[in-house]
């Protein structure tokens, strides 16, 4: 795939370094039963590392040029969603019909990871914080998330009150 010119309005920055990509995948530890959603696959380098390692792989991309390239280069097993991750209903991807009814309570109770999504992404700086809050609203559908974030975002998240990096997220 030829290189795509990152678009500033989408805050795009792409992963290229093979060693870093392998470390990300190792930290994520994908399992053959996982349903993974990747936010902002970009040129698909992380996506390609996940193909064949998980049961289902969905990607959410807003850039139409990248979507066209991804459709040409990724296997059909990857479902590509042309959407803004800030407005995307991640829970719509999580299965809800196969949850057994509890004998004790009579309600549908989902075991800790049953039917939940695993979310991964190299998040753009300009939407990192609102996207994290959007995903927290849908946390009941997600078992875990692993994101690459710009250092400034992480510094602000872990800053102590009164510190130079402390401020509203």
Where are the regions a protein language model picked out?
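Short, low-complexity intrinsically disordered segments enriched in A/P/G/S/L with frequent Arg
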Residues: 99-104, 110-112
């Amino acid at each position: 795939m030829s290189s795509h010119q990152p678009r500033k309005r989408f805050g795009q920055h792409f992963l290229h370094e093979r060693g870093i990509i392998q470390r990300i995948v190792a930290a994520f530890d994908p399992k053959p039963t996982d349903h993974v959603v990747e936010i902002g696959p970009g040129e698909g380098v992380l996506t390609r590392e996940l193909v064949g390692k998980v049961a289902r792989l969905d990607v959410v991309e807003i850039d139409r040029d990248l979507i066209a390239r991804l459709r040409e280069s990724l296997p059909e097993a990857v479902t590509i969603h042309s959407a803004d991750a800030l407005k995307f209903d991640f829970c719509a991807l999580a299965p809800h019909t196969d949850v057994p009814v509890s004998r004790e309570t009579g309600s549908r109770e989902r075991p800790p990871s049953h039917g939940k999504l695993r979310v991964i992404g190299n998040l753009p700086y300009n939407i990192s914080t609102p996207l994290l809050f959007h995903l927290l609203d849908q946390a009941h559908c997600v078992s875990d998330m692993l994101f690459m974030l710009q250092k400034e975002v992480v510094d602000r998240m872990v800053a102590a009150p009164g510190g130079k990096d402390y401020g509203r997220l």
